[in-house]
Amino acid sequence: MAKERVDVLAYKQGLFETREQAKRGVMAGLVVAVLNGERFDKPGEKIPDDTELKLKGEKLKYVSRGGLKLEKALQVFDLSVEGATTIDIGASTGGFTDVMLQNGAELVFAVDVGTNQLAWKLRQDPRVVSMEQFNFRYAEKTDFEQEPSFASIDVSFISLSLILPALHRVLASQGQVVALVKPQFEAGREQIGKNGIIRDSNVHQNVLEAVTAMAVEEGFSVLGLDFSPIQGGHGNIEFLAYLKKEESASNQVLAEIEEVVERAHSQFKNE
């Protein structure tokens, strides 16, 4: 398990605007772990880099800060899940599921290959169907009681090229998708830097060109593209793609890719 300084992690997770503020905040005892409330007061202390942090006394909007990714996507792509049956692929603790519910989803299939990760409050919600130890790449329409019209994808250590064919089988015609594109799991091994981090904007651009082209081949139009407001593991920049299942699929973001990558690198240039 890779480790990171507490102050650096707090900064990367957006708790502070600068590294110096993060350092002072940690020293003041303002930073705690979301999971167990453990308080950190030594900026240089190294903790697992997947430790989710929050400010002391802060009430998180969703069960996971990761929910902010889908929140941004719904806003920038002007999407609605009101009254919809949806799938959260790679649900984990359920940040995306929580966003969907708070935005009026009628039913959410929370799918994950792992077990015992979904937040307790979501497990107890009658609108949530928890599907643990479920490998979505083998999913079939019959696995779901209702046909979903919206899906989110946030998976790790697997390419979207293994997820989209299954989603095409399951999703309703004209169904909408928000997919988190993680270049570190899409690029060739030779393109990935130290500690699994990709810093080269050209690699990001190449990955987005390849992934969006692949999505079209799998029957999804690519209608929107932006960058995730939160960096992924080890500080990787990640991207949000808006897809739609259509008979005549097309890539409508090709001309935007370079500009989106530039904005992302500008946003995270000091991180």
List each model region and its residues.
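Flexible, glycine-/basic-rich loop-and-beta segments that form/coincide
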Residues: I237-F239, L243-E271
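Glycine-rich SAM-binding Motif I of class I
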Residues: G94-G95, N116
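S4-like RNA-binding module at protein N-termini
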Residues: E4, E20-L79
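Conserved S-adenosyl-L-methionine
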Residues: V99-L107
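Conserved class I S-adenosyl-L-methionine
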Residues: V81-S92, M100
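S-adenosyl-L-methionine
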Residues: V108-L162
